[in-house]
């Protein structure tokens, strides 16, 4: 699911609890009768590091997030009450009273990464989700919802520990992302800034139905679901306009249009009336056209573009949220393994493999064409898909440079300032400058030389809170396969697509 790849639901990388799917399947009565047969106590510990104490970083090499991002050596950055209040040469820096002084010894200080497409409900292990819809029904009770919140909390903290300071959710079960966002914002525990949709909106038989999307049977139902999400506190609306690789029954038809234009248009109209942007899962040219006509603000994933679609991207439809032009979110991470790894490893059929090739090619082609036409392109991982962990945003940045063909500076600029602007957060985060939130990532090596430097940050700060324990619980088997892909030359992708008759 998600990108059509299937979804590893509930395999949290950090949770001390057993996998929810494993727990429920081995204890089928555990969550019956509102969880009364088995009482599972979930403790959401308070692990917030205070932002009250000022911090002074000295001897930093600043990469500010701007497009050309010239390194600024021997610099200092002062953080007070969660905000960058001063920047200048380390030689003249003065620590505020009581400040913690951190000598970076020349390390590279940059804005925290922003991940534009995240499902927090899984770990990225390539396992079957099984009957996820039935599992959701068992979890829809007070104890089950507490378990889901605990898992999403762990995933959010994995994102943060890996250097991601802002996450835009793409739909998770049981509105749990809204609760996690509120807990983070209230200071109950550390986590990234979370732009949360609650659940998505789909149609009968559509992507995400019964898992992380509500089913709308008509335009009126879609509009009502959007209004309900707004009342619950959603920051963005997620639509599932097309199917994906695993929905297709024949080679050549991934991304079949599922949501009628009138349903998508009703959802967009209701969202825009209350100021909410709309993001949409789309994996076909037909779907992109329908979504943009309906008023969708960001196309997630993408597909090959026609001249008519390029005009819609430029805002010719006039139905997007006021003040915003439509954009595309590039998500290479879930597509690439299905092209470059053996089907035995991805658990895909021959039909799914070939349709995966089509979608992967379309995502890359869409990003290239959009950039050439001046359309904004953001970056996200589609975390929770097979082989897409909660700690690998750095890989998406590297894939963007490698396969779309942009420079390292532009890739990092996209993952910071551009993503912030696309979220409407450009005045708050995305660059290192006075007055903005202290969302900071530090690496030993220069990512402008090698984006793999982003893999192991030495310091992460979000809204002025320094993460004291950068613990990323890695999945060695997944990492090994992805490292092998990273080592392949860019030409390997084109060669594989050509072999399958796609390129």
Per-region residue spans from a language model:
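Active-site metal-binding motif and surrounding structural segment of the metallo-beta-lactamase
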Residues: 90-110, 137-139
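Metal-associated gating/positioning segment near the N- to mid-region
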Residues: 108-183, 294
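Histidine/acidic-residue-rich catalytic or RNA/ligand-binding cores of hydrolases
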Residues: 125-127, 177, 247-250, 288-294, ...
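Active-site microenvironment of metallo-dependent hydrolases
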Residues: 2-7, 25-75, 79-83, 90, ...
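Active-site beta-loop-alpha junctions enriched in small/polar residues
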Residues: 119, 172, 199-201, 242, ...
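Histidine/acidic residue-rich metal-binding segments in metalloenzymes
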Residues: 179, 220-327, 342-347, 357-377
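Active-site gating loops and adjacent loop-to-helix segments of metal-dependent hydrolytic enzymes
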Residues: 122-148, 190, 198, 202-210, ...
